[in-house]
């Protein structure tokens, strides 16, 4: 199942697994859009277990560890993100797009907020020449105006 969203100059094409429960929340539907050129491809999957990345640690925080795996930057997110066994989400950032794997025992359903937080939306907006200092929106005719 593909879903498309656009905001602040960034377009996201979410490829979600068929048959999995997905929640857009109440905010995301107003950012829905038609597919267009230049969208960032984001593949989201749920797995029973996550595979530990093989690479050099670039950064380590209490809730995220980042690895340089050569052709990808891989981030493990979770309360104890010191490895795949303790992580709830692993995100692989490649030139071709972003692949997010969520651990089934942690996430019963895929939530839009978890996906958007994982992909680093503010970084994508910055790469598109924008900035997010504080975000809020109003709904106008079923669509959102972000400010």
Short names for language-model regions:
Residues 147:
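Hydrophobic anchor at the beta1->P-loop junction of P-loop NTPases
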Residues 1-144:
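A noncatalytic interaction/capping subdomain that flanks phosphate/NTP-handling catalytic cores
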